[in-house]
Amino acid sequence: MDRLAKTICVVDIHKLQDFAQRFVVGAILDEVFADKEATGQRQPLQVILLDELNKYAPREGQSPIRETLVDIAQRGRSLGIILIGAQQTASRVAQEVVENASIRVTGRLDAAEAERSEYGWMLPSTRARARLFKPGTMVLFQPGIPAPLVFTFPFPPWATRKEEAVEDDDPFEGLS
């Protein structure tokens, strides 16, 4: 990939089998990390958004991808690699990855998960409140804000699923 092209490259792996998904993710992470280490240049920044982070950097067990993600979490920012990980529960992700996250966003938590040390950045009252969050409500923590911030994403004014769409007349019909 030409990383200097200043483009967004989305690699959709959802149709691949589990082994193939791990292979593709591992190959991309290795390539990005090796390129950044070789050049020593922070710019251009490389942003990696990885869903189901617990699958690639699990708390328990070892894997080459896990070690690469731990390395990126520990040294990535200084190399210009930004890792954005998404997962259902932070307690299932490698501790080194969670501890090195500078920005944390959490949605609704169940009672057992809320008491885990991974959520120690939240005030006890916020942890209790997070158990009752409705869909779209989140807590944001980042170093520039002195206390965690609770916010709600607005409901989108358009259909997000095909079954929600309403078949209307074409508003532009008859215009030339």
Predicted regions and their residues:
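Conserved ATP-driven motor cores of ASCE-family P-loop NTPases powering translocation/secretion/packaging/pilus
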Residues: 65-157
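Poly-acidic low-complexity segments
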Residues: 1-4, 8, 12-14, 94, ...
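P-loop NTPase motor domains
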Residues: 1-74, 78, 138-144
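Short acidic, S/G/P-rich loop/turn micro-motifs used as interaction or catalytic elements
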Residues: 16-18, 55-57, 90, 158-163
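Glutamate identity and glutamate-enriched acidic tracts
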Residues: 31, 37, 52, 60, ...
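Generic signature of intrinsically disordered, low-complexity segments enriched in small/polar residues
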Residues: 26, 59, 136, 156-158, ...
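Charge-patterned, long linear interaction tracts outside catalytic cores
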Residues: 150-176
